[in-house]
Regions:
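Charge-dense, helix-prone N-terminal extensions
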Residues: 1-162
Length: 162
């Protein structure tokens, strides 16, 4: 009689985990999250991508250090859509008044498509946020994808059916 070998599953890579987190969104939202992520990766190639999987949202921060507090921008995806947060939002010049929110540290804009990131007023905000960052991004290299937290309680990230 052969002894049965118990196969221990290999832990998922950070990229595989992120794909799983994104898969819980509606298909249209999945496409948006991936396209915005690609655009921000191009914009911040040396940034650490910090992923926080909360029960009602998926947050991806772009940090020069790997610490969330140092993130320059972050996306937050939920059933209501995708927002781009600027960590020093209240201090950023916003002549077109596109920044929303009233917090002491952040402001955000709604992202309808990755093309939103190419708008001159959004580009200006991104440039200023980069220039004003307390810690600057490394000039070269490729940042890592880091799963910072994953919620134990998983809830669907789709709009409730009416």
């Amino acid at each position: 009689m052969k002894a049965s070998k118990e196969v221990t599953p290999r832990p998922l890579s950070a990229e595989q985990q992120l794909r799983g987190f994104i898969a819980r969104f509606e298909p249209k939202q999945q496409v948006l999250i991936r396209s915005v992520r690609r655009a921000l990766r191009r914009r911040f190639p040396s940034a650490a991508e910090l992923v926080y999987d909360y029960s009602r949202s998926l947050v991806i921060g772009y940090s020069p250090t790997g610490r969330g507090i140092d993130s320059v921008v972050a996306t937050s995806s939920g059933a209501d859509g995708l927002r781009l947060f600027f960590n020093q939002g209240p201090t950023l010049p916003d002549p077109k008044k596109i920044l929303l929110g009233s917090g002491k540290q952040t402001r955000f804009i709604w992202i309808e498509s990755s093309r939103t990131l190419k708008l001159p007023e959004v580009n200006a905000l991104l440039e200023t946020a980069i220039d004003r960052a307390k810690i600057h991004f490394p000039p070269g290299g490729h940042g890592k994808l880091i799963i910072k937290s994953a919620s134990a309680k998983k809830q669907p990230r789709r709009r409730p059916k009416r």
